From Swiss-Prot:
PANTHER family hit by this protein: SERINE CARBOXYPEPTIDASE-LIKE 46, SERINE PROTEASE FAMILY S10 SERINE CARBOXYPEPTIDASE
Sorted UniProt keywords: Carboxypeptidase, Disulfide bond, Glycoprotein, Hydrolase, Protease, Secreted, Signal
Name this polypeptide is given: Serine carboxypeptidase-like 46
Principal subcellular localisation of the protein: secreted
One cellular-component annotation, GO: extracellular region
Enzyme class: hydrolase
This enzyme's EC code(s): 3.4.16.-
Family the UniProt entry places it in: Belongs to the peptidase S10 family.
Native species: Arabidopsis thaliana
Signal peptide start and end residues: 1-25
Molecular function as annotated in GO: serine-type carboxypeptidase activity
Length: 465
């Protein structure tokens, strides 16, 4: 057989295999396509949701929700969003309370006018197994889960998810999240970089983490100064909270099941003065008194601007919506090993001591590898206050020898100050979001969208109206 004919046949075979692979992937993704969510207004973009099995032997599967970009999805990046906890849902919190296209309102969904899928294809992942609709056939899979397991599972998820959606393979990929995602996001990004050394699968373009847990002592001990500076605790209590028992010491003792009498005394006094009617995740706002959830998990923002109203019990509505059978059917979701979908898992046994393991060093390794890192903080959050995050970013910049390229200054959203920002080198940025809570996109959606656009574009935040 002539050489040219052999080459032609080989090329044809390769093209045929590629075509078959594409057809197979199309069938897989088509099965996950959402026709329409109950109560949803008409939209022009596609939605998908379903499962990716990350462990066939133990039947461990992670649940995802993809909201493609409102316009030109083919030309826009893919953004993975992870909520923290550990053990809280990126579907219920991220997609349906923060930056997704819809928010529940009674029996219907209303459009989020500041949804992040205006700028990107948004992928929300319920992780680890045991969170939300993600499940395992054996309850033992929910025990002893830790950061290492979660990072590996998230990597496997992405590898297999790309088999369903190969059209996203070469797309610019960003990883974002908040709170304990200060562990999830850097750890996943680190594994992706390591994997790319052999396989070059991920087109990672940057990470963004909001009010993130990055270094146990610095993050949590900044709470005392925040409480005091905002008038939530008295001078004597502030002194006790910084000298007799700081918050990282209390948490460390609490996680080990042996809280000292001194820490019990100090935290009791702090609790009395701050009161249980203050949302620690947003100290300026009201709480949802009849909430079916723990108060500490409810984000209750005030109106962002004149004429805008916000439901302070939004998480209640999300819980009710996602527990509807018709909604679960539309999402291709099912409950395994639990009777009810919850915002934060009540079956997951996570290794709480992992919170004490710093990830700021991993963030530094990402910066050195050329991955842009954006750390942002809602300035009304007392749980992971901006002061701790700002200190950590500044310290990291000094350790890496990065010069300041954007001096500390205000940035604008519309005709108002959106917050303050500083940039080091070309890869490390910090910003505050004025008036925002722990969950920035929920409490300040317009400002969060401005920040998100700048992050995706690799640009400094606006310094003019």
């Amino acid at each position: 057989m002539p050489r040219l004919q052999c080459l032609t046949m080989a090329t044809s075979l390769i093209l045929l295999l590629q075509a078959l692979s594409l057809v197979s992937s199309t069938i897989l993704s088509r099965a996950d396509r959402i026709t329409r969510l109950p109560g949803q207004p008409r939209v022009g973009f596609q939605q998908y949701s379903g499962y990716v099995t990350i462990d066939e032997k133990k039947q461990r599967a992670l649940f995802y929700y993809l909201a493609e970009a409102e316009t030109k999805p083919i030309s826009k990046p893919l953004v993975l969003w992870l909520n923290g906890g550990p053990g809280c849902s990126s579907l219920g919190v991220g997609a349906f309370s923060e930056n997704g296209p819809f928010r529940p309102k009674g029996s219907i969904l209303v459009r989020n006018q500041h949804s992040w899928n205006q700028e990107a294809n948004m992928l929300y992942l319920e992780t680890p197994v045991g969170v939300g609709f993600s499940y395992a056939n054996e309850s033992s899979s929910y025990e002893g889960v830790n950061d290492k397991i979660t990072a590996k599972d998230n990597l496997v998820f992405l590898q297999k998810w790309f088999l369903k959606f190969p059209q996203y393979l070469n797309r610019s990929l960003f990883i974002t999240g908040e709170s304990y995602a200060g562990h999830y996001v850097p750890q996943l990004a680190q594994l992706m970089i390591q994997y790319n050394k052999k396989h070059n699968l991920f087109n990672l373009k940057g990470i963004a983490i909001g009010n993130p847990v990055m270094e146990f002592a610095t993050d949590f001990n900044s709470r005392a100064e925040y409480f005091w500076s905002h008038g939530l605790i008295s001078d004597p209590t502030y002194k006790l909270f910084t000298s007799s028992c700081n918050y990282s010491r209390f948490l460390s003792e609490y996680h080990r099941g042996s809280v000292s009498s001194m820490c019990t005394k100090v935290l009791s006094q702090v609790g009395i003065e701050t009161s249980r009617f203050i949302d620690k995740y947003d100290v300026t706002l009201d709480v949802c008194i009849p909430s079916v959830l723990s108060q500490s998990k409810v984000v209750s923002p005030q109106p962002q601007q004149v004429g805008e109203t916000v439901d302070v019990c939004l998480e209640d509505e999300t819980v009710n919506y996602l527990n509807r059978r018709d909604v679960q059917k539309a999402l291709h979701a099912r409950l395994v090993g639990t009777r009810k979908w919850t915002v934060c898992s009540d079956v997951l046994d996570y290794e709480v001591l992992d919170v004490e393991v710093p990830t700021i060093n991993i963030v530094g390794s990402l910066v050195k590898a050329g991955v842009p890192v954006f750390v942002y903080s809602g300035d009304q959050d007392s749980v992971i206050p901006l002061t701790g995050s700002r200190t950590l970013v500044k310290r990291l910049a000094e350790e890496l020898g990065l010069r300041t390229t954007v001096p500390y200054r205000v940035w604008f959203a519309g005709q108002q100050v959106g917050g303050w920002t500083q940039v080091y080198g070309n890869t490390l940025a910090f910003a505050t979001v004025r008036g925002a809570a722990h969950e920035v996109p929920f409490s300040q959606p317009a400002r969060a969208l401005v920040l998100f656009k700048a992050f995706l574009g690799g640009r400094p935040l606006p310094e003019e109206f």
